[in-house]
């Protein structure tokens, strides 16, 4: 049995992750759950927090105290928290699955450095469908080339704090790489006022934050007379949770290195 820990266990995504671990039919088991040290829920049973009933795993406020109790840590929290957790796992030689978004370029370098010592799966989105879309986007960009205008539209719930979403940015990176462009140079984030004619090489991003939208992403390839749209819509966070647990199982026996869901799904 793969021993899995969830950090941010008292949050919405944390509860979904706990449920996904417990749905593996014995292939994995939740052996540690961690949240903020000042949480009033520390000591509560993680299964009860997730609505699953008692499973005998108390919520801890200190990752360092439970590092011997798991093989892989799943982290969907905040960059500042994740970076601290990476150092803990690095010292304890524990694998990680990271779904946190909003990292700066420098922070991503720190993550890559840690992956020299431990195996890490890091992805902007753990949905199988989204990762299939990334493969399709690479193909579409290579086929349609410079003959189309490319726009990326994403929508999420009102509580999401980063924009554009990590998934939208990853989609932009895939398209830009396929076309030999640097996303940092061609991305346009929102438009307002007299913007002038659209430059063909740009990749536009539009962001919506409203209600309880779990996650919608559309990449539009628009040419004269036709357009191609590649869309993914998530209706439940469980799709991300199940993907993360799948990644945790896949990591067993893997050497140190930085992997993503394309590796997990065999899409490379």
Curated annotation (Swiss-Prot):
Binding sites annotated in the UniProt record for (S)-2,3,4,5-tetrahydrodipicolinate: 157, 166-167
GO cellular component: cytosol
Protein name as catalogued: 4-hydroxy-tetrahydrodipicolinate reductase
The protein's role, per its UniProt record: Catalyzes the conversion of 4-hydroxy-tetrahydrodipicolinate (HTPA) to tetrahydrodipicolinate.
Binding residues for NAD(+): 8-13, 35, 99-101, 123-126
SUPFAM superfamilies membership: Glyceraldehyde-3-phosphate dehydrogenase-like, C-terminal domain, NAD(P)-binding Rossmann-fold domains
Pathway: Amino-acid biosynthesis; L-lysine biosynthesis via DAP pathway; (S)-tetrahydrodipicolinate from L-aspartate: step 4/4
Principal location: cytoplasm
Organism: Pseudomonas paraeruginosa (strain DSM 24068 / PA7)
GO biological process: diaminopimelate biosynthetic process; lysine biosynthetic process via diaminopimelate
Enzyme Commission designation: 1.17.1.8
